[in-house]
Design a protein with these regions (language model features):
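Histidine-dependent nucleotide/RNA phosphoesterase domain, centered on the 2H-phosphoesterase fold
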Residues: 1-182
Length: 182
């Protein structure tokens, strides 16, 4: 099963992101845009895991949740990771020491359970589209699409599975851990 650990987003946040995504689509020729129901913030991509690994992941996530308390993030920008004339469109967040601490704790807990660290480190973003090709250029899109700042409540982390349902990719939560730290 193909998995990742993520922060799930509330419907209100997903609606807000979908509005920014729709504005961006008007300025683009084409792209593979993320369905609203799949918006999330990835903390650690695991890839293919065995069913037996779930118990170890639960232990790592429990330890992480025990050491971190709920916090708030702020969504505040739209950006691109360009790859030639196409790129990945994302929504970005203000820097957060709480998010960095959550990520660091998760990485240590996963490593103690025998999993590899995230090779790219933490680059907090919510993917809005892949293979996005703007009519003009990425800078033009960024100038013309405003993402009004919005607060995101982070109360839990979830182990998600990527499941193919026909032509669609669906992210299914396998379990969640509420943040309980002090």
């Amino acid at each position: 099963m193909r998995t990742f650990i993520a922060i799930e987003l509330e419907e209100e946040v997903k609606d807000h992101l979908a509005e920014a995504q729709a504005e961006t689509q008007k300025l683009c020729r084409r792209g593979n845009f993320t369905p609203k129901e799949n918006f999330h913030l990835t903390l650690h991509f695991l890839g293919e895991i065995a069913e037996d690994d779930i118990e170890y992941l639960q232990d790592a996530m429990y330890e992480t949740a025990r050491r971190n308390r709920p916090f708030t993030l702020t969504l505040d920008k739209v950006g691109f990771f360009p790859r030639g004339n196409k790129g990945i469109m994302w929504a970005g967040l203000e820097r957060s020491t709480h998010l960095q601490r959550l990520f660091s704790t998760l990485e240590k807990s996963l490593e103690q359970q025998g999993f590899s660290r995230e090779r790219k480190g933490l680059s907090p973003h919510i993917t809005l589209g892949r293979e996005v090709e703007p009519h003009r250029n990425f800078i033009d899109v960024q100038k013309n699409v405003r993402l009004e700042p919005m607060k995101i409540s982070v109360r839990s982390i979830a182990l998600m599975e990527s499941v193919r349902k026909g032509p669609k990719l669906v992210y299914v939560p396998l379990f969640r851990m509420d943040l309980k730290g002090r």
